[in-house]
Amino acid sequence: MKVYFCGSIRGGRDDAELYHRMVAKLQSFATVLTEHVGRRELGDTGEHVTQGDRFIHDRDVDWLRQSDVVVAEVTQPSLGVGYELGRAVDMKKKVLCLFRPSSGRRLSAMIRGADNGDSFVVRDYCQDEIEQVLEDFFSNQK
């Protein structure tokens, strides 16, 4: 199984440590195509690739096409994550969006309203339960 993990990069890296934990857990279930999102040292300027933004876009869309499941941490608002989710829906990918209400933020209605309980799932969670949330989700994906 291949997982495309979405998390904010240029929109802010406040959750970088959490992304690291999530990617580590996801790797116990599947190949994570976007493991770089979980790198603690990745700053909000993004990756330093000489090929530029077009290269990043095309590479990531290719990874999205290859993926079986998309897991997105959506607490930190990010235009890129929203774009990835829209593309994932268009590609008919199974999507799990994870949101922490304790952040004080409100999740966009375009994300929460897309939850259909099947191919697009939005789950509220607390940081200390993230590993269990992922285990529960992936135990139903086999």
UniProtKB/Swiss-Prot annotation:
Superkingdom of origin: Eukaryota
Gene Ontology CC: one annotated term: cytoplasm
GO biological-process terms attached to the record: deoxyribonucleoside monophosphate catabolic process; nucleoside salvage; nucleotide metabolic process; positive regulation of cell growth
Record field: catalytic activity: 5-hydroxymethyl-dUMP + H2O = 5-hydroxymethyluracil + 2-deoxy-D-ribose 5-phosphate
Pfam families: Nuc_deoxyrib_tr
Iron keyword on record: no
SUPFAM superfamilies: N-(deoxy)ribosyltransferase-like
Keywords per UniProt: Cytoplasm, Glycosidase, Hydrolase, Nucleotide metabolism, Nucleus, Phosphoprotein
GO molecular function: 5-hydroxymethyl-dUMP N-hydrolase activity
Location(s), subcellular: Cytoplasm; Nucleus
Statement: the UniProt record of this protein carries the keyword Nucleus: yes
Residue numbers binding 5-hydroxymethyl-dUMP: 7, 9-11, 78, 80, 84, 108
The protein's Enzyme Commission number: 3.2.2.-
Record text on subunit structure and interactions: Monomer and homodimer.
Function summary: Part of a nucleotide salvage pathway that eliminates epigenetically modified 5-hydroxymethyl-dCMP (hmdCMP) in a two-step process entailing deamination to cytotoxic 5-hydroxymethyl-dUMP (hmdUMP), followed by its hydrolysis into 5-hydroxymethyluracil (hmU) and 2-deoxy-D-ribose 5-phosphate (deoxyribosephosphate). Catalyzes the second step in that pathway, the hydrolysis of the N-glycosidic bond in hmdUMP, degrading this cytotoxic nucleotide to avoid its genomic integration.
HAMAP family noted in UniProt: Nuc_phosphate_hydrolase (MF_03036)
Family that this chain belongs to: Belongs to the 2'-deoxynucleoside 5'-phosphate N-hydrolase 1 family.
Protein name: 5-hydroxymethyl-dUMP N-hydrolase
